[in-house]
Amino acid sequence: MIRDICRDESFLAQKAEPAAADDLGTAQDLLDTLSAHGDGCVGMAANMIGVNKRIIVFDNEGEYMVMLNPVIVKKSGAYETAEGCLSLAGTRKTMRFQTIKVQWQNERFQTRLKTFTGWTAEIIQHEIDHCDGILI
């Protein structure tokens, strides 16, 4: 189901709770909402649709990917960039890393570990910031 975008900064600033099996519907809602905003959005976190759970979805080189309970376990190659967000007006400067290693669970709650680089790494960092209550 396509959900409305949350723009309440006090809600967005809350740290997300871990995702569980009964949150898989939220993951599907995120995919539906991201797809509906695909012309100007490349990733979303659950708090962007008003759900305080640690779930992100993003465009992984042309295919949408879901991460439950993602955590960055390694990062390198710091750089400064400016990003925008559906939940916030305008663009803002932030620090990102060229290469990140992420641990997460897939939709079957199997633990995964993968290294991401470049644009995909930047998207993931932005969405994990949402999960951590960090507003760019």
Residue ranges and their predicted role:
Residues 1-136:
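Positively charged
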